[in-house]
Curated annotation (Swiss-Prot):
Belongs to the PsbJ family. PSII is composed of 1 copy each of membrane proteins PsbA, PsbB, PsbC, PsbD, PsbE, PsbF, PsbH, PsbI, PsbJ, PsbK, PsbL, PsbM, PsbT, PsbX, PsbY, PsbZ, Psb30/Ycf12, at least 3 peripheral proteins of the oxygen-evolving complex and a large number of cofactors. It forms dimeric complexes. This is Photosystem II reaction center protein J. One of the components of the core complex of photosystem II (PSII). PSII is a light-driven water:plastoquinone oxidoreductase that uses light energy to abstract electrons from H(2)O, generating O(2) and a proton gradient subsequently used for ATP formation. It consists of a core antenna complex that captures photons, and an electron transfer chain that converts photonic excitation into a charge separation. Its main location: plastid. Pfam families: PsbJ (PF01788). InterPro entries: PSII_PsbJ, PSII_PsbJ_sf. The keyword Lipid metabolism does not apply. NCBIfam families: PRK02565.1.
Length: 40
């Protein structure tokens, strides 16, 4: 936690990227199952 030398820590990038990817996949699958994403 104290190893941040002005740069963004790698674990923070991985966490944010993982949350974004999971969120996008969740929205995509939810849309496709509810019929909204069937046109994609």
């Amino acid at each position: 936690m104290a190893d941040t030398t002005g740069r963004i820590p790698l674990w923070l990038i991985g966490t944010v990227a993982g949350i974004l990817i999971i969120g996008l996949l969740g929205v995509f699958f939810y849309g496709s199952y509810s019929g909204l994403g069937s046109s994609l």
